[in-house]
Amino acid sequence: MRIGHGFDVHKFGGEGPVIIGGVSVPYEQGLIAHSDGDVALHALCDALLGAIAEGDIGRHFPDTDDKWKGADSRALLRDVYRRVKEKGFVLGNADVTIIAQAPKMAPHIQAMCNAIAEDLETELDNVNVKATTSERLGFTGRKEGIACEAVVLLVKAS
């Protein structure tokens, strides 16, 4: 068994929508990033890479490489999961926490779970996504950006 933890943050800027958890969420601003700025999938990639001792997303998909400019984070997640399987592991479960004052995530949570479960080749009940606010405190509370944490449990493939 292996456990991994990931964290990511992006600030708001430009035009919406926000891409998060593999889902397009309507909002007046987007997230500033080299790729599509999907903080949930970036945190999940970091958690998976950490669990297999393969560093972080920046090591594998550096923002200094134009190859990854505007990259679809679902494609990055699938590539990371391929690495997980090559190391002899599969997902036990994933738990993702989105921290945002806005936009409202609740209407999109199920679609996020569906996308993540598909990309990680797992059953829906192995994936949990939830959202919370920071009670109007800090940069997320001031609606300056979105943060996300993810935890994964990997088990040996049978």
Curated annotation (Swiss-Prot):
- Catalytic activities: 4-CDP-2-C-methyl-D-erythritol 2-phosphate = 2-C-methyl-D-erythritol 2,4-cyclic diphosphate + CMP
**Purpose:** Involved in the biosynthesis of isopentenyl diphosphate (IPP) and dimethylallyl diphosphate (DMAPP), two major building blocks of isoprenoid compounds. Catalyzes the conversion of 4-diphosphocytidyl-2-C-methyl-D-erythritol 2-phosphate (CDP-ME2P) to 2-C-methyl-D-erythritol 2,4-cyclodiphosphate (ME-CPP) with a corresponding release of cytidine 5-monophosphate (CMP).
Quaternary assembly: Homotrimer.
> EC top class, in one word?
lyase
Q: What Pfam families does the record point to?
A: YgbB
Q: Which GO terms describe its biological process?
A: isopentenyl diphosphate biosynthetic process, methylerythritol 4-phosphate pathway; terpenoid biosynthetic process
Q: Where is this site: Transition state stabilizer?
A: 34, 133
Q: Which UniProt keywords apply?
A: Isoprene biosynthesis, Lyase, Metal-binding
* Keyword Lyase assigned: yes
Q: What is the organism of origin for this protein?
A: Aliivibrio fischeri (strain MJ11)
Tell me the gene name.
ispF
Q: How does the cofactor bind to this protein, according to its record? A: Binds 1 divalent metal cation per subunit.
Q: Where does 4-CDP-2-C-methyl-D-erythritol 2-phosphate bind?
A: 8-10, 34-35, 56-58, 61-65, 100-106, 132-135, 139, 142
Instruction: Summarize where a divalent metal cation binds, as residue positions.
Output: 8, 10, 42
Report the EC code(s) recorded for this entry.
4.6.1.12
Q: In which pathway does it act?
A: Isoprenoid biosynthesis; isopentenyl diphosphate biosynthesis via DXP pathway; isopentenyl diphosphate from 1-deoxy-D-xylulose 5-phosphate: step 4/6
Q: Which cofactor does it need?
A: a divalent metal cation
State the organism's lineage. Answer: Bacteria, Pseudomonadati, Pseudomonadota, Gammaproteobacteria, Vibrionales
Q: Which named protein is this?
A: 2-C-methyl-D-erythritol 2,4-cyclodiphosphate synthase
Entry's Gene Ontology molecular function annotations: 2-C-methyl-D-erythritol 2,4-cyclodiphosphate synthase activity; metal ion binding
Q: Which family does it belong to?
A: Belongs to the IspF family.
